[in-house]
Amino acid sequence: MTGQGRLERRDGAGYEGDFLDGQMHGKGTYSWADRRVYQGAFRNDKRHGSGTLRWPNGNQYVGDFLDNRRTGTGRFVSAENDVYEGEFLNDQMHGNGAYVWSDGRRYEGLFRDGVKSGMGVLTWPTGNTYEGQFLEDQRHGLGVLYWRDGTTYQGLFALNQMNGYGVKTIPNEVPVFQQWRMGDLLEAWPIVESDRCRLNIDDAPWIFAGSSCINGQAHGSGIAVSVDGQAYIVNGRFVLGRLIQGDVKALPSPESQ
């Protein structure tokens, strides 16, 4: 069959539209027995090209299809009025996109296999914002958390919690280098330059919290954070104000909001 036609299947599904050599090919409408409906392009008996897929619960997708799957760019609106616009792969949100929840939350960034994974920005209706790494739908890795009042935390996260080391800055207060364990604050060190125990790395001043100082120089084992709050060292070894052993790790830089 070639041209316009109608097809009815034993399982209750049906198609009405263009055919080419007996296959759905061109523009048409396909309906399933469960009341899903697809309207759009077909190629070689498959949904392929631009189209609209509607579910009986009110969900709707408008965008690209490839070999029967949502692949390419598109817009998905849920029955709850959540909206996603961006890239899809094999029926999943995958790649760059933006998701807006009906409660006002918004995420813009990378998705993988249907969840937030990679770099992104999450904003709450309160005005608070997180910018950084995500893994399997959770804040995980390096990031910066911005509060509406101007407070920032730049550091490590795990499973949506502050976890590891970071710098918290409150307006009109001294920045504080902190250690967290799954949302619980373990220790904190104000970042204040002092002549009592000096430390310089790459000609920049650092704050040292360690075992001892000799002649005003950082000496022994301990942790250190740069005065600008952009880097830190854990389990370092220092001799008379110099780093002998330990890795310098960068912290994300907060930008003006």
Residue locations for each model-derived region?
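Glycine/tyrosine- and acidic-biased, solvent-exposed loop/turn segments at the edges of beta-strands
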Residues: 1-257
